[in-house]
Structure formats: structure tokens, C-alpha cells
Design a protein with these regions (language model features):
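Short, small-residue-biased leader/transition segments that mark boundaries at the very start
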Residues: 2-4
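Active-site-proximal beta-strand/loop segments in catalytic clefts of secreted hydrolases
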Residues: 46-49, 88-91, 127-131, 155-158
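N-terminal low-complexity, Pro/Thr/Ser-rich intrinsically disordered segments
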Residues: 6-23
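Active-site-proximal helix/loop segments of hydrolytic enzymes
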Residues: 102, 106-124, 130-171
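Residues that cap or initiate secondary-structure elements
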Residues: 17-19, 49-51, 159
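Short amphipathic alpha-helices and their capping/turn segments at secondary-structure boundaries
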Residues: 23-39, 114-117
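Active-site histidine-acidic residue metal-binding/catalytic motifs
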Residues: 30-102
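Long, folded non-catalytic interaction modules
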Residues: 14-16, 25-29, 94-113, 138
């Protein structure tokens, strides 16, 4: 667990994880390469909160939302890496024209389950969001002279220290 924390992962103080649950030896022994040779979809990109926008987004322009970001990531993975991507552009957090995030994960789950049943070749599933941060926070750093946005991969444990396992979310 300490190695995970020392290499860029954060374990939130409201939860916990054991070495057995991480199963690092099992993970490190797996071949995680994606073989695009079959031409079948290997990556699924979707957006539980597809209406999320950025500070400079133009109102009503879907290309300026996280869905537009997903379009660009799809293009890069397909054109630069040859990895076939299924990009689900469904806006799961707008119901009858009104933004409603309360059931977005339920709606997305139904949609994603159907896609995964239709395309069992998919190996990687990415739900792309954007974080809301204070106006004075800048999540850009210089990498080799290129301004680069910080990204975060979130792998969640469905339990809290206070209440234990969360019954409706499976680890």
C-alpha cells in the first residue's frame, strides 16, 4: 500500500485499502497491452456528466463540453495509436432538457451495460469528467516546454471508514 501512495496515488482519508485488496503482484504480472489488430473496439469513452463545461466553453456548443474532450481523445487514440474507440456521446445528466445529475450514474450504467454487451471486445472503460475548482487554482504545469493540464485517474473503493462497505456499490 505504501508503494502505491508513494508513486502518485492518493488514498482518501475517508476510506482504506489493504495490501490484499490491491493485489499488486497479480496486477503487475498481467499483460495490460491493448492489441488493436482485430479492429474491434478496445476502449469505451463515455461521460456520466456530459453537460460539464469549462471556464471558456461557449454556451450550447457540445464540442466545448467533456464530450468534445472525449471526441479529441478518441481521435488521438485512433489516429495516433491505432486503437479502436467507441465514444458514447450520450448526455446522461440532462433529462427532458433539464440538467439533473441525481440519477446520471444510473442512466449511464444502463447505457454502458448495453454497449459492453454489444461490444465484448472492449477492454478499457473511461468516464471522463472535469473537476470544478476555485478560480485561483491552476491545474496546468509545464512538461518539456508544453503547458499541460493535470489529469486524474480515479479508482474508487466503495466503503467509508465510518460506515463500512457501501451495499449498492460493488468493490
Amino acid at each position: 500500500v505504501r508503494c502505491v501512495e508513494e508513486t502518485g496515488y492518493t488514498i482518501d482519508s475517508s476510506t482504506n485499502v489493504t495490501a490484499e485488496e490491491l493485489a499488486a503482484d497479480t496486477l503487475l504480472s498481467k499483460d495490460l497491452h491493448i492489441d488493436p489488430a482485430s479492429g474491434e473496439y478496445k476502449v469505451l469513452i463515455y461521460h456520466t456528466h456530459g453537460s460539464e463545461t469549462f471556464a471558456d466553453s461557449r454556451p450550447g456548443v457540445i464540442e466545448d463540453t467533456v464530450i468534445g474532450l472525449g471526441d479529441e481523445l478518441t481521435r488521438i487514440l485512433e489516429e495516433d495509436y491505432g486503437i479502436p474507440v467507441y465514444h458514447d456521446r450520450t448526455v446522461y445528466d440532462v433529462v427532458d432538457g433539464v440538467e439533473d445529475r441525481s440519477l446520471a450514474y444510473d442512466y449511464a450504467s444502463d447505457g454502458i451495460d448495453a454497449i459492453l454487451q454489444q461490444y465484448p471486445s472492449i477492454e478499457v472503460v473511461l468516464d471522463i469528467h472535469r473537476d470544478g475548482v476555485r478560480e485561483d487554482v491552476r491545474l496546468v504545469r509545464d512538461i518539456d516546454g508544453v503547458p499541460t493540464a493535470q489529469i486524474m485517474f480515479l479508482n474508487g473503493m466503495s466503503r467509508t471508514n465510518e460506515n463500512g462497505e457501501i451495499d449498492y456499490l460493488y468493490n
